[in-house]
Amino acid sequence: MAATMALVDNVDEQHALERLLEESKPPVPAAASRLHWLLSTPFRYPPPPGGSRFRGPDDPGVFYGADEIRTACAELGYWRWRHLLDTPALAAMPTRPQTVFRTALSVACVDLRTPPFAAERAVWTHPSDYSGCQRLGRVAREARVGAIRYESVRDPGRGGCCAVLTPAAFARKAPVEQQTWMLSVSRDQIVWQRTAAVRQTELAFAPAIWGHGAGRAPSARRVRR
């Protein structure tokens, strides 16, 4: 709501603007209506052209998460950097606050890092061809598998990630914990910073870790602030 306050003169106008914005958005699916907006948002919006790793262009929503903060920061940082590359007029993106949060799941899942799935590791970790992963996502839904655990492609440490295929997978209606981090993105560096009490934590990524061309997908994934 802070972003809309800058566009109006008072709180009443802000509330009116927020209502108009909410009415213009796609409806929240009934299955996700009980959830906090941080959890329901991925199920609310259509995918980008070409889809995402486990979501085809015509598939239902997928919530993407990671086991560790560093892995989540690498994944999101990559896509923000990709957006910057697709905007030639910008040398850097303004530093913005980001909400990093933890949630709990209770659902049947498959782990692509274990047999027999591990034999197809090259398919699951391809930097730009998502066709095999999207087919698996559809098969998993048909088998009533609620989540897919897999190896991060953007984290140099290859941390664990999870694609949540259904809103029913969440054990709680809201995040368990939230933190605010500041994200700065330039063409040669992605930096995350968090200051808590007297301690500052920083995570930095150089685009070189993603290789030549950074594994460009069919289209840039839209990332929500």
Where are the regions that the model predicts?
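Active-site and NAD+-binding cores of ADP-ribose-processing enzymes
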Residues: 1-56, 78-81, 85-225
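A short, exposed loop/beta-hairpin motif centered on an aromatic-Gly-Thr core
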Residues: 61-65
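Contiguous mid-protein beta-loop-alpha structural module that forms a pocket-lining wall or clamp
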Residues: 71-77
